[in-house]
Each structure stands twice: as C-alpha cells, then as structure tokens.
Amino acid sequence: MRLAIVAGEASGDLLGASLIRALKRSVPDLQVEGVGGPLMRDAGCRCLHDADELAVMGIVEVLAELPRLLRLRRGLVKHWRDDPPNVFVGVDAPDFNLGLERKLRRKGIKTVQFVSPSVWAWRQRRVHKIARSTDLVLCLLPFEKAFYDRYDVPAVFVGHPLADEIPLYLDQSEHRRKLGLPENGQVIAVLPGSRRGELKRLGADFAGTIGWLASR
C-alpha cells in the first residue's frame, strides 16, 4: 500500500509523524511519500519537499510566494497523477491541501483531510469546498464530527495524538521542580507557536511583554 501525505509547518509534521507510525503498526510494508519535516522523515516518509516550504503566513508574504506555491502544487498533482497512491492525506494546511485534494480526487484518488479547518467558527461556506475535495475528514475535536454530520460530509473523530502522551492531571509541585520553578507563585506560559515567520515578526514583542510582566 502506498500513502501520499502533505504537511505544512512543525505542528503538521508532528501530527503527520504520529499518523504514519500508527498506520505502519497495522500495515508494516506501508510506503509513504510527500511533503513533511524531520519527524515525518524519522517515521518513514520519503519527503519530496520540506514542510517549511509551505510555512507562509501573512497576506503580503503569501502573495509574494503564491507563484512558487502553485508551481509546487502543480508538480505534486502531476507526480501523483502519473504514479497514483492508494490514498492521499492532507495534514492541516487547508489553503494548500484542499485544492490539491480536489484535483487528486478528480483523478480517482481517495483523499483524507487530517485536521478540520475551523469551519464551525467562521467561513462556514468552506464546508462545501471540503465536501468536494475530500472523501473523509479526520477530526481532532469531538464536536467537529457533529458539524460535518449536518452537511453529510464523512467525518471521524480521532482525537489529538498529544492526548495520549500528556496526562490529563499533572502533579504541579513535581513539574515545578523539574522546570526549576519556585514551589509557590504565579507562572505564565508563553506559547508563541511553531511558525518561523510568526516568531521572526513577533518574537521581539513577546520578549518585551515577558520583560514587562516580570517587572510587575
């Protein structure tokens, strides 16, 4: 069996790697190729392109990179049209993957979208594009399946892989000791995300805010 997969940025690489490992436990001889990062490579994916090539944020940046992204997508369509996989999985990155899925589906290739766009929160009309593009949506959140059921879009709730790795309840004192934090006092977690572009643009603002909070 041969799987094609495309993930953008670090979070998609993490999810894609967990999916590949899970599938290989059931299908040991599974062949995987596509777009991914170091975690997906370690899980056994032959990467045609690196996930960082899709990690573009901001209107100006996207417009500047649009010709390159369209060329990349056309190249993937041609590659998999000429040598079709059994299944294609798009991991998040809906602006890139849904268009790719639609083109591949027209060629008779089964397509899966892993991670639903936030259609339940905004731009709900995208659900019709999703219905045209994919044979199945793998949902991280339980209420997402109920949303797709209303539109007769096949969907399955699979949960988030990190839920299997991080306990629901943590010993606060133990983890404070591990992190070298005082037993008492307030702790604020700063989570800037995984996109390099966002870190580059907003890193100084995060650092300034942390310094301001620490001085209060």
Where are these regions (language model features)?
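Active-site and donor-binding regions of nucleotide-sugar-utilizing enzymes
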Residues: 2-178, 191-199, 212
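Short acidic-capped amphipathic helix/loop micro-motif used as an active-site/signal-coupling element
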Residues: 203-208
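Short, intrinsically disordered, charge-balanced linker/junction segments flanking boundaries
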Residues: 210-216
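Nucleotide donor/acceptor-binding cores
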Residues: 1, 186
